[in-house]
Amino acid sequence: MFTFDLTRLDPALALSAAEVLDQIGAKTGENGVPVNAKQGGEGLRVSLQDGVLIEYQHKWEFFRGLALARRVLRSGETIEEHPGFYRLGFFEDLSRGAVLTVDSLKKKIRYLAAMGYNAFTLYIEDIYEVPEYPWFGHQRGRYTKAELKEAVAYGKRFGVTLNPSLQVLGHLEMPLIWPAFKDIKDSSAVLYVGKPEVYEFIDKLFKNLCECFESRHFYLNMDEAHTMGLGRRLAKEGYVPKGELLAIHMEHVGKLCEKHGIVPIIATDMFFRPYTAGNGYYSTDTIVPQEVIDRVPEMYRIMYWDYYNCEKSEKSAAMFEHMLQQHERFHNPLMFLGGAWKWMGFAPNNVFSLYSSDFHINGCLRHGIDDISVATFGDDGSEASMFSNLPTLVLYAEKLYKNTTEKVDIEEAFMDLFGLPLEAFLALDCPNRIPDGPDIPNSASANPCKYLFYNDPLNGRLTRLVSHSYKPHFAECEEKLAVWKADRQFGYIFETLSALCRVLKNLATLPLELREAYANCDKAGLEALADSIPGIVSDLDDFTDKFRAQWLRENKMFGLETLELRFGGQRGRLVSTEKLLRLYLDGKLDRIEPLETPLLYPDGKDAAEPDRPVNNYVEYCYDNTLPAGVPHC
């Protein structure tokens, strides 16, 4: 392990450098290798000159250079990089339950700085304080103004600009559940376009965020507003095409942006959906009409987001290329947003993220897109660790600093940054890599570790997808993940997922085994299964404890209640299942009717397909009976 002497640096820079070095497992001390810094010129250069010399243009490059210093010391070779971007950013979803503590935000900032990112965007639908609207973000863990200001100031120390990503059209399910917002509501998630009260509301959002963020680059999104104009507005004013409503809304919001000095950035899917079959975003033949393009005010920057398309098929690759070409027809500055998958359940999808991201970055470089970010989301409750998808962040940095479309090896960079081999974090995917699951190119939203966890023991909608091979698979995953549970920084993530696999090695196949024993009138088998349930419940309790510890280590307490209610519901069903089995075995019940119901494929088809067991949110795992007030997020 190298020790670095920071005494030659400016004191403020040395303080931040010490925090980054500590974060990535390096030591500091006056007897260490001297670190010298020289700002000027273009790009980043790290060499051995009277210790380590870091020559950089921008502050964020210095911290990347600091992280590269150990590589230079090991090899004795100079590293020189000429980044191929204007902005390299990371989007963190803080709106689906998990809200990072300020300490966790700072930890993310230090890691982003060490990788060389210069932007950190907080996706906060209603996760910020707006005093004029006390119900906005109520009981959701919203950040106070003081917390946001603290995070912004901290990022500035490392050259990492914090930006807000908010919603000013759709994706507002959570605040709009409150009666206080009934006057600005069109449908359950979408604002009433054109209504004056809506723009008074947005004005207050802008005002309060401008008090917290120094950056005026605001990501306003306006994406996936599928029911725009189809709710209360339709009933009161009649039908207006979505394209016209979007233009009206952009004009009103644009005036507010001018008032507050905001540079607005919006998603583009709502420009494409009216002209794409099935109201989709991606297509190989959709042509956005020129009149639609011309109606987008020049003040807006546009964001093409794509987490799915890749080289999995000629059609998918062609779709990505066509979408890039369509976006180039707009007269607005273009940015690209890719995905670091962890939003389909308890485990990330690092392997697919690396596979698709390499393709996305190459496309951006070919088309000269220099504003590039990678996002992560927390759909349906933010069940995965907020630090479980780091490999993709490393890939974005390594490729864009090298400005290359060639394959890059991120293993050395990953080990230097996080103190674990890349294979460890790729192993976090294993709970979703079931034996009969889809191959990597088709595995974007595969989440068996979620739907198997929530599948009801007796009434399981998804039991048709279960295989006996899952038991040894999850037993192997349990052991594989436990290898790294002692790691200082991230051991808790491996411990939590190992505990999940310990539950699943018996729970996943329980519904299938119950059906088989019941169908065969195998009462001895049913009794053995009933006897196994208390052990599963005990394992579930242990997983719940470890999951809670993981949550509280990373996040505010808010949002945990939703998942604990779900866990408790499954626990209750297991306890009830054992009791029902005992009643049946004792002759007090004549039948267990759910076990007599034929099994069907949940998607309505009648034959297995390799890519079928994917994308099952918790509401599909059992009847829509979440307790009142518990969001599906």
Segments (PLM) and residue ranges:
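Short, well-ordered secondary-structure micro-motifs within conserved domains or adaptor modules
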Residues: 2-4, 19-55
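Feature activates predominantly on carbohydrate-active enzymes
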Residues: 1-3, 49-265, 335-338, 343, ...
